[in-house]
């Protein structure tokens, strides 16, 4: 995993969406709980957002579903946005100091009223995907 290529995927999604990073109120991290991957992803997210955006990983609930994880996490991210409640990363008690300066959602869920969210998936072999979703109105 490379922070540079992850950051590029995030930047492309933001640019394609036509919104700014300040409009995105939550990021669903790929977050596989691997040292190299999580550090790279958090650093890439910090680099692009330039602020401590709220972030958590849904894999802590169901593990890594391989090819299905992107679909599952995108759907769950949209559902959380609709409900204005975002799940924490389970069992995340200590943030590695090498991770990016982000607003890690831990302990309990959080109410966030946001019109835009991002879902990231950074897969084997450098297949990187970032999607921005807008609340349906």
Identify what each model region corresponds to.
Residues 1-137:
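Conserved "HGTGT" condensation-loop signature of ketosynthase/thiolase-family condensing enzymes
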């Amino acid at each position: 995993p490379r922070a540079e290529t992850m950051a590029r995927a995030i930047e492309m999604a933001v640019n394609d969406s036509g919104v700014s990073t300040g409009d995105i109120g939550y990021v669903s991290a790929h977050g596989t709980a691997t040292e190299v991957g999580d550090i790279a992803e958090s650093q890439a997210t910090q680099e692009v957002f330039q602020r401590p955006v709220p972030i958590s990983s849904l894999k802590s609930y169901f593990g890594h579903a391989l090819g299905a994880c992107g679909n599952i996490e995108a759907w769950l991210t949209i559902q959380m946005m609709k409900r204005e409640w975002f799940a924490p990363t389970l069992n995340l008690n200590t943030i590695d100091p090498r991770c990016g300066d982000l607003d890690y959602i831990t302990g309990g869920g959080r109410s966030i009223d946001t019109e835009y969210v991002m879902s990231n998936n950074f897969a084997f072999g450098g297949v990187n995907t970032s999607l921005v979703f807008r609340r349906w109105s």
